[in-house]
Structures are given as C-alpha cells and as structure tokens.
C-alpha cells in the first residue's frame, strides 16, 4: 500500500488549466466512483478549489501507477496528457503526508497561512466518506492533518496577522474599538473587497451595518447575507453621523466623502471619533479628512504597510510551522510502518499457534490411548522445535548461499542470536 498526493495548483498551472481540471460539487460522487473503480485505487479524496485540484489516494504499488492515474485524470476531463503532465506534481508516502499537512495548515496557499483551506480540506474528506472512503490509512492521514493544522495555529503566529486588504481593514477596526458589537459600520461599495469586509465584520459580531452603493440590487444581495441596511450613495451625507467606522471601496473616479461632509458628521456626533478606511484607488475619501480632529483616516497604502509587516511575521511563523509538519509527518509514517509490521506479527503468531495446536492435539490423543507420557512429550518438543525453526533455518541457509551478509545479520538480530 502506498499513499499518494497528485495534482496542480496556483503555482504550477494557470487558471485556464486549473478550471479544466476542477471537479464540480454536483459531479464529485461520480468522479469518486470512477476513481475507486480503478483496480489499483483502494481509497481516495478529491480536493478541488479555485487554486488547486488534488487527488489523495491509497493505492497498490505497480510499475505503471503514475501513468495510469494521469491517464484516468486526463480521460475524465477530456485533456491531452501533454497539457497536464508539465503542471502536475506527484508526492508519495512521507512526501504525500507532508504535503497534505502543509495544505491543511495554509503553508501552500496563495495567501500564506489563510484559514479557509482547512475547511475546504475537511469538506473534501467528509464528501469522500459518503460511501467512498475504503482505506483506513488514508482516513488516519486526514485526521492527523487536521490535528497538525490546529497545532500550527495554536503554537505559531501563522494566522495572527492580517495579510489581505479586507482582513487588514477589519483588524485595524478591532484594534481601535474595544468591541465591534456596539459600533455602527458604514460600508461604501458592494464589490468583492467590501463583501469580504462585511463577512469579517459579521464574524466579529457587528450588530449594525449600513451599505451604500450606486446600484441597490447588488448591495441588497450582500445586505441580506450579513443583515445590513442598504442606502444610496446620495444618502451618505445624511447618514454619515451614525457611523463609527467607514470602510470604502468603489470604482468612483472622484472622492465620495469630502472634508465638509465629515466635519458636519463630527459636529452632529459631538466629536466622537470616526475611523475611515479608504481602500479605493482612486481614493473615495478626500485626503484632507485626515487633518480633522477625531477623524482617523487610513488609505490603502497604510494598509499595505501593515500587510507587508504582517506578511514578514507570517513568513517567520511559517518556518516554525514547517518544523512541526516535518516532525508530525515523520511520526505518522513511523506509525504507518508499525501498523504494517503488526499485521505481519499477527500472521506469524497465528501460524505458530496453529502448529502448536496441531501438535498438542496429536500428543493429547496419544496420551489418551495409553502411550508412554515421557516419549510423547519428548516427541512433541522435538516436532514443535523443528516446525517452528524450519522457515527461519531456510532463510538463513539461502542468505548464506547468496553471500548476503546484511540479510544474515538482520536474521540473527530478528532471532535474538548474539
């Protein structure tokens, strides 16, 4: 039995190839059935995200294993093998275990240390268990990878610092306000970045969010998801005074929030502080706003400096995480080898017990027929000894004939000979 990890990701293949190799959720069961129908595959998990498609397999070793699996993948997706081969990576046993642990821990992600991948790996594993998981070794490898990912998160700072603009904006807000549950947040725009910001804020228990956008329909979809109120851009001047935090990211060529607008809002708020985070390029907030007392303005460049600093911290934490992964992968493979040895030990003991029971039964039958007890016991001891040492003796003789001193020494050690 061999453990394998093979696939492509954002580092080895462009999106034009990744999208052709991806497995859609509605066809995943069919793909797993097809994969497990391959004679060499004992168990399999398919991980398919926007940045990677990977197969994790428990397989029987054979000479054409790699070619057979590449051929299956290409046939399933109607791909030319040459198109895929140069982008495909292949990891076996310890390297496969280490790769999965790195993926689950966010060490192989586009954004170093991002936590979402662990949930995606867990879902891929759960999907495989719906009648598809047949290999206990593969199941144990995934369960171990989940605990390693948790250990990496607990023992290192790999996920402690923001490395995306959206996450950095939310982190900044959490640093300035003791609790986000009591603040009002105004989000300007409804694009991808604002969507991420809104979801982060919801996770941190923000109770009141207002979304201002040029088109109400797009904003309403996001508002329904996060429980926010939708207003028009033209309503910002009137509603700005309610906001403790303003995060803006639109494609407007001109500023949406001016100095005068913020001055009026601060006056209505009796100069309670406001945090303004302008993620847009060109800027949505006039730079002069930053000169106002109690208005704390951060631009996308300010966030980038935070992100650069945090990324350096994550890279340092990744070194610690890699050490954890290497240690855990080594220990898992030692456990796997022990499991393989235990099966051999069980077979050996079963064989010896069978010989013992067979010869003991014959000896007892002879005693019941009135045979000489001493002679019967001596015969039992002689036959039992010969039967038990027969196979090791043949192995020693063969090693001697072959001049294989290394094997001779291994056999001597196994038999406890000094």
Curated annotation (Swiss-Prot):
The record marks 99 as: Important for activity. One of its GO terms (biological process) is protoporphyrinogen IX biosynthetic process from glutamate. Its EC number is 1.2.1.70. GO terms for molecular function: glutamyl-tRNA reductase activity; NADP binding. CDD domains: NAD_bind_Glutamyl_tRNA_reduct. It is an enzyme of class 1 (oxidoreductase). The keyword Transport does not apply. It catalyses: (S)-4-amino-5-oxopentanoate + tRNA(Glu) + NADP(+) = L-glutamyl-tRNA(Glu) + NADPH + H(+). The active site is at 50 (nucleophile). PROSITE patterns: GLUTR. It holds the Pfam family GlutR_dimer. Homodimer. During catalysis, the active site Cys acts as a nucleophile attacking the alpha-carbonyl group of tRNA-bound glutamate with the formation of a thioester intermediate between enzyme and glutamate, and the concomitant release of tRNA(Glu). The thioester intermediate is finally reduced by direct hydride transfer from NADPH, to form the product GSA. NCBIfam families: hemA. Belongs to the glutamyl-tRNA reductase family. HAMAP family: Glu_tRNA_reductase (MF_00087). Catalyzes the NADPH-dependent reduction of glutamyl-tRNA(Glu) to glutamate 1-semialdehyde (GSA). This is Glutamyl-tRNA reductase. It comes from Escherichia coli O127:H6 (strain E2348/69 / EPEC).
């Amino acid at each position: 039995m061999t453990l394998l990890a093979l696939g492509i990701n954002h580092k080895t293949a462009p999106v034009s190839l990744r999208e052709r190799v991806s497995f859609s959720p509605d066809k995943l069961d069919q793909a797993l059935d097809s994969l497990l129908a391959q004679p060499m595959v004992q168990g399999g998990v398919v991980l398919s995200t926007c940045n990677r498609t990977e197969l994790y397999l428990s397989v029987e070793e054979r000479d054409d294993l790699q070619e057979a699996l590449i051929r299956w993948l290409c046939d399933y997706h109607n791909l030319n093998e040459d198109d895929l081969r140069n982008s495909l990576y292949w990891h076996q046993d310890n390297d496969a275990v280490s790769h999965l642990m790195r993926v689950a821990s966010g060490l192989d992600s586009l954004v170093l240390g991002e936590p979402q991948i662990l949930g995606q790996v867990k879902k891929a594993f759960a999907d495989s268990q719906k009648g598809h998981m047949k290999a206990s070794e593969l199941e144990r490898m995934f369960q171990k990878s989940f605990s390693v990912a948790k250990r990496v998160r607990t023992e290192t700072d790999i996920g402690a610092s923001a490395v995306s603009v959206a996450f950095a904006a939310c982190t900044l807000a959490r640093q300035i306000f003791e609790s986000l549950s009591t603040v009002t947040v105004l989000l300007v725009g409804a694009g991808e970045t604002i969507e991420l910001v809104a979801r982060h804020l919801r996770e941190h228990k923000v109770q009141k969010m207002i979304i201002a956008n040029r088109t109400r329909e797009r904003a309403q979809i996001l508002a329904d998801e996060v429980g926010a109120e939708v207003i028009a851009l033209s309503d910002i001047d009137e509603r700005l005074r309610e906001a403790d935090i303003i995060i803006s990211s639109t494609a407007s060529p001109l500023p949406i929030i001016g100095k005068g607008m913020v001055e009026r809002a601060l006056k209505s708020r009796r100069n309670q502080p406001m945090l303004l985070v302008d993620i847009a390029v060109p800027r949505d907030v006039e730079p002069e706003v930053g000169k106002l007392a109690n208005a704390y303005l951060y631009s996308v460049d300010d966030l980038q400096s935070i992100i650069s600093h945090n990324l350096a911290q994550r890279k340092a934490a990744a070194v610690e995480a890699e050490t954890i992964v290497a240690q855990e992968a080594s220990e898992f493979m030692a456990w796997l080898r022990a499991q393989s040895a235990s099966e051999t030990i069980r077979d050996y003991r079963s064989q010896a017990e069978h010989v013992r029971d067979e010869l003991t039964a014959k000896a007892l039958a002879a005693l019941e027929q009135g045979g000489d007890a001493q002679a019967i016991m001596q015969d039992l001891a002689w036959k039992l000894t010969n039967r038990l040492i027969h196979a090791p003796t043949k192995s020693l003789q063969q090693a001697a004939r072959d001049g294989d001193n290394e094997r001779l020494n291994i056999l001597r050690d196994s038999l406890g000979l000094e």
